[in-house]
């Protein structure tokens, strides 16, 4: 169809004259239009044939682009670059994510320590070079699956391993920091509280027992912590350095605000050494001049006193208070006994003991002779006056005499003697009928007119 240029009437392409106005159409224009339409139709056919090829080419381009995008983010080199960038930029959160495993979660603070440790102990430039070379060798190798990057001192700091593939084409590289166990060994049962793996952690360590506090990646650590003992609560730090360990563990140094007490006693020469005690904050402990007591919190006053026995009597010092402001890591204090009071009492008791010993020497000299006479004559009456009637010892000796089983004794020596009211205990060294020296403990009763009688006896 075509339009009349004069009146606009529609007409067939082969019509020569317009039926509306009689205008005569140009035959050359019709021929041109026909040729143009044929060209368009030919071009359309060609275009339809090219579309599938264009789509295929476009898809191929997309695949190539996608491959390079995947390669940029998933190839071993790309994985290496992610870790390197995180360390270079001190991105502790990214490093923590990359190093965390199912069994050991690394928090951002631990990652921060790790980053600094790499820069100090390897050097960033050297670390990047070692990491790239290691990844390249593993990627090319058909047999090796893992390798370590080390510090200048030869300690392992990063494990690089092949762990399957990504998107079929790329080796999946795994970066894992080796761990060690920091260990504590407190002098008394201690509870430690600190943050690890992004969570609050509590560790209870028994006295003088090696106890691990967790698993940590390489670094030089100073972890804020609280510890609690029978002596109180302490604020401070747990410190440990991987450079100081060549094993699977690393010793922890405790840095807390604590005071240790050294005690010196004066005026205690007459006291029994084994009886000496120190009482700190109402807790009594055995005294030793070489012992350090504590630790105790530096933010609280400390009360301290000492006690000891002489001749069965307990003597104490005055209680002293050490102000918190005077407490230091090593704090020394001197406690004074009233030496004159102790010496007067000891002198008095020694006189009494000497008098008692003299009585006992006389008593046991007579008793040994009477005992032997009773044995020789088979007559209990010789010894009966030395033993309290009605006591189990009285009946036992009487039975032995009648059976002829009473043992002869000689040369009695008084080793020790104590009097409590009307009761006396004495340790006596004798020679028995076999000629052997034996120590026996006797209990006596002092009756009217200071008369002594045996109640019981036993071997020491």
From Swiss-Prot:
Q: What's the protein here called?
A: Membrane-associated protein TcaA
Keyword Zinc-finger in annotation: yes
Q: What is its main location?
A: membrane
Which GO CC terms are listed, alphabetically?
A: plasma membrane
List localization entries: Cell membrane
Q: Where are its TM segments located?
A: 50-70
Q: What is this protein's function?
A: Plays a major role in decreasing resistance to glycopeptide antibiotics.
Q: Which residues lie on this side of the membrane: Extracellular?
A: 71-460
Q: Membrane: is it a keyword of this entry?
A: yes
What membrane topology does the UniProt entry give?
Single-pass membrane protein
Entry's family note: Belongs to the TcaA family.
UniProt GO MF annotations: zinc ion binding
Stretches of the chain found on the membrane's Cytoplasmic side: 1-49
Q: Where are the zinc fingers (C4-type)?
A: 4-21
Q: Pfam families, from UniProt?
A: TcaA_2nd, TcaA_3rd_4th, TcaA_5th
Which superkingdom heads the taxonomic lineage of this protein's source? Bacteria
Q: Which organism is it from?
A: Staphylococcus aureus (strain MSSA476)
For this entry, list what GO says about its biological process: response to antibiotic
Alphabetized UniProt keyword annotations:
Antibiotic resistance, Cell membrane, Membrane, Metal-binding, Transmembrane, Transmembrane helix, Zinc, Zinc-finger
């Amino acid at each position: 169809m075509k339009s009349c240029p004069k009146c606009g009437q529609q007409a067939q392409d082969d019509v020569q004259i317009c039926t509306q106005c009689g205008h005569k159409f140009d035959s050359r224009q019709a021929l041109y239009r026909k040729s143009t339409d044929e060209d368009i139709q030919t071009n359309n056919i060609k275009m339809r044939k090219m579309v599938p090829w264009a789509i295929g080419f476009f898809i191929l381009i997309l695949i190539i682009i996608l491959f390079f995008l995947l390669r940029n983010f998933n190839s071993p080199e790309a994985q290496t670059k992610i870790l390197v960038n995180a360390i270079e930029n001190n991105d502790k959160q990214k490093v923590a994510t990359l190093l965390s495993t199912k069994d050991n979660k690394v928090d951002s603070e631990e990652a921060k320590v790790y980053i600094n440790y790499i820069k100090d102990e390897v050097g960033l430039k050297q670390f990047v070079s070692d990491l790239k070379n290691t990844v390249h060798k593993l990627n090319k190798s058909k047999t090796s699956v893992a390798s370590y990057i080390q510090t200048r001192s030869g300690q392992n700091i990063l494990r690089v391993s092949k762990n399957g593939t990504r998107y079929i084409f790329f080796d999946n590289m795994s970066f894992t920091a080796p761990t060690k166990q920091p260990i504590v060994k407190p002098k008394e049962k201690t509870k430690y509280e600190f943050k690890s793996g992004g969570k609050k952690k509590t560790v209870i360590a028994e006295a003088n027992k090696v106890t691990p506090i967790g698993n940590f990646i390489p670094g030089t650590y100073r972890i804020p912590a609280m510890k609690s003992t029978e002596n109180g609560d302490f604020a401070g730090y747990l410190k440990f350095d991987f450079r100081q360990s060549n094993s699977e563990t690393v010793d922890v140094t405790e840095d807390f605000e604590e005071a240790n007490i050294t005690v010196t006693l004066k005026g205690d020469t007459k006291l029994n050494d084994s009886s000496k005690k120190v009482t700190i904050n109402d807790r009594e402990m055995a005294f030793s001049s070489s012992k350090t007591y504590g630790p105790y919190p530096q933010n609280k006053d400390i009360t301290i006193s000492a006690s000891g026995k002489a001749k069965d009597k307990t003597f104490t010092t005055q209680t002293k208070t050490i102000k918190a402001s005077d407490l230091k890591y090593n704090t020394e204090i001197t406690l004074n006994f009233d030496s004159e009071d102790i010496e007067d009492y000891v002198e008095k008791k020694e006189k009494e003991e000497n008098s008692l010993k003299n009585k006992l020497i006389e008593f046991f000299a007579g008793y040994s002779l009477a005992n032997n006479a009773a044995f020789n004559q088979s007559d209990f009456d010789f010894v009966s006056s030395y033993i309290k009637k009605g006591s189990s010892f009285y009946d036992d000796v009487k039975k032995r005499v009648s059976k002829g089983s009473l043992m002869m004794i000689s040369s009695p020596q008084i080793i020790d003697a104590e009097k409590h009211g009307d009761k006396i205990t004495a340790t006596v060294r004798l020679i028995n009928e076999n000629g052997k020296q034996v120590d026996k403990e006797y209990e006596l009763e002092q009756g009217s007119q200071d008369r002594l009688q045996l109640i019981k006896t036993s071997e020491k």
